[in-house]
Amino acid sequence: MKISYSLLVHNETDTLEKLLEFLVKYKQPQDEIVILDDYSDDEKTKIILDYYSSAEGVVLKQRNLLGDFATQKNYLKNMCSGDYSFNLDADEIVTHWFMKDIHEILNGNEVDLIFVPRINTVEGITEQHIRGWGWQVNEKGWINYPDWQGRIFRNRPNIRWEKPVHEQLIGFQTYAHLPMEQKYSIIHPKTIDRQVKQNQKYSEILR
C-alpha cells in the first residue's frame, strides 16, 4: 500500500519545515509527499520547498489558490499516486506512533474515509475569544476536541472536495474513526494572531 501525504502551502515557514522534516523521516519508503504551493513569496518558505523538492518521494507543483480551497485540494488530490491520500495542513503534524501504525490501520479497515481526531490549541486565547467563537475548551486546553477531520481517504475519482472554505469530502461510501487518543490525533497548534488572521481570510473569501 502507498500513502500520499498531501499538503497545501502558502508562506508557512517554521511549521512547514518541521512537518516536512518529520514526514521525510517517518514515512514508509513507498509513500510520497505531495505539495501544492500557492506561489509562496516568503524567501524562507521558498528555500524550504526548494530543499525538500529534491528529496526522494517528494512531488512539488505550484498553482494559484484563487480563493477556492476545494478546487485547490482536488487538484492536489489528482497529483497523488497513492492508494490513500492523507491531507494535512502545513501548520499541523502527527505523532511518530501515528506514522508507525497508519499502514496497519488502513490494511485493517477497508473503508473509503477515515476520520482523525484533531487537537487544537491556541496560544494567547482568552475567555472573551472562547465565548465569542463559541468554542469548547477541555482541561488540557484542547479546543473542540475531538474535532473530527475527514483527512485519510481512498484515491478515487468519485471522492473529492467541495465548498471553497471549510471544505468537505464527498463521494465516499464507507468510513471509520480513529481512536480518540493523543497518539492518533492531528496536532494543530496556533497563536491567537494567526487564528485571527485566518478568520479574516475566510471571511473575505466568503464575501
Where would I find each of the regions flagged by the language model?
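Catalytic-site signature of metal-activated, phosphate-bearing donor transferases
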Residues: 70-77, 84, 93-207
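Short, well-formed alpha-helical segments that are part of the catalytic scaffolds
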Residues: 11-26
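Short beta-strand/turn micro-motifs composed of small residues
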Residues: 7-9, 37
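A conserved acidic beta->alpha catalytic loop
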Residues: 22, 33-48, 65, 89-92
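Conserved donor nucleotide-binding strand/loop of the catalytic core
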Residues: 46-71, 79
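Conserved beta-strand segments of alpha/beta enzyme cores
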Residues: 32, 57-60, 176
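A short acidic, amphipathic alpha-helical/loop segment
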Residues: 18-22, 47-48, 75, 100-102
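Cell-envelope/extracellular polymer assembly enzymes that use nucleotide-activated donors
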Residues: 2-4
